[in-house]
């Protein structure tokens, strides 16, 4: 049975982790960062400590401190703070999940272990169930990013297995170019939120019914992507295509600079 409650939709910025010149996390600028996203980019949802936030390269302590600051400063200004809690070890993931719940996060998400990988889909479901159980009151989203994890199971098949096994399961952050798999998820599992994570081809995912999108570029291209969403929803596909193409031209330059460092420089 799907987790009941509010649905995630629209643009969700995958936040960068601010750093000092000494490579320490810079908590002092997070309030300003939140205000910038809300006031300048019209973003009201964030995904923290994920790939863009370099969460897998941070210590557990650093991730907890970041979660606390993001939740504190987003309260009353944003609609949702989704905290990525995935780690290479199950106990750390559960620790972060419980901590996110205690801080007042709105949802959690997790990639699966990518060093010693789940042997099959059933093993992956058991892992996700264990992580989600540490924060049973929070909606849980699986973070699918096969380019980095090497986990290439079809998400369409995964959703069929989690449906009756993880009560708090709410959907998937789908960061892959396989639009056939994505489309099947959207059409067959309407109770779940299917959030697309490849910014440069968002329009294609919208055509297949994406409920929302999570991405790094919404930190600085939130308004432009918002315009594209509005054009698409209004049925003005020509305008939506024009905006998507202009975004792609810009992102081609940004990604050529080295994806995350280039984006962070913006």
From Swiss-Prot:
Class of the enzyme per the UniProt entry, highest EC level: lyase
Residue numbers annotated as active site: 143, 173
A single GO BP: N-acetylneuraminate catabolic process
Keywords: Carbohydrate metabolism, Cytoplasm, Lyase, Schiff base
Cited Pfam families: DHDPS
The keyword Lyase belongs to this UniProt entry's keyword annotation: yes
The protein's Enzyme Commission number: 4.1.3.3
Binding site for aceneuramate: 51-52, 175, 197, 199-200, 216
Entry's Gene Ontology molecular function annotations: N-acetylneuraminate lyase activity
Disulphide bridges: none
GO cellular component: cytoplasm
Catalytic reaction equation(s): aceneuramate = aldehydo-N-acetyl-D-mannosamine + pyruvate
Domain of life: Eukaryota
Pathway: Amino-sugar metabolism; N-acetylneuraminate degradation
Main localization of the protein described in the UniProt heading: cytoplasm
Annotated function: Catalyzes the cleavage of N-acetylneuraminic acid (sialic acid) to form pyruvate and N-acetylmannosamine via a Schiff base intermediate. It prevents sialic acids from being recycled and returning to the cell surface. Involved in the N-glycolylneuraminic acid (Neu5Gc) degradation pathway.
Family statement: Belongs to the DapA family. NanA subfamily.
Description of how the protein assembles with itself and partners: Homotetramer.
Name of protein: N-acetylneuraminate lyase B
Lineage of the organism: Eukaryota, Metazoa, Chordata, Craniata, Vertebrata
